[in-house]
């Protein structure tokens, strides 16, 4: 069962590794990111960052969708971490029933507009987010579970 879908350009780091799994009793993390899945060094580094007692997959969006829709992880409490809005939109197209997406960190870059404390969106990322919103998905900006969620839907 998917407990959290999160966009975070850093993929696995302190907030993702410690705060969210504890708050949501996560026992399986899927990093669905083509770059990480295709780079052995990045995959190894991310594997070292995973919390004890939590299993980890570093796979593509397509592989994540297949794994999640196959029923193989129905008994698990899963957190899916994606690196960007494009992969998130592709993921949502393949995995039905996603109702909330956590925007945890999208890096500042040239031409990006700030929407939240750690959320900077380019025109394409805004378009991707609007497409997610149009699917009826609640887009919450929140870095850690202890913070209040700020709704991105209202700002798009």
Annotate the PLM regions.
Residues 1-2, 24-27, 54, 74-77, ...:
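Short coil/turn connectors at secondary-structure junctions
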Residues 1-55:
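Long, hydrophobic N-terminal alpha-helical segment
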Residues 5, 31, 57-60, 80, ...:
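General beta-strand structural signal in soluble alpha/beta enzymes
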Residues 37-39, 64-65, 108-111:
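Short gly/pro/ser/thr-enriched loop/turn and capping motifs at secondary-structure boundaries
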Residues 46, 88-92, 129-130:
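Short amphipathic alpha-helical segments and helix-helix/interface helices
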Residues 47-49, 75, 119:
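Short, hinge-like loop/turn segments at secondary-structure boundaries
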Residues 59-104:
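Ordered, amphipathic secondary-structure segments that act as subunit-interaction surfaces
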Residues 94-156:
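Glycine-rich, aromatic-bearing surface loops/beta-hairpins
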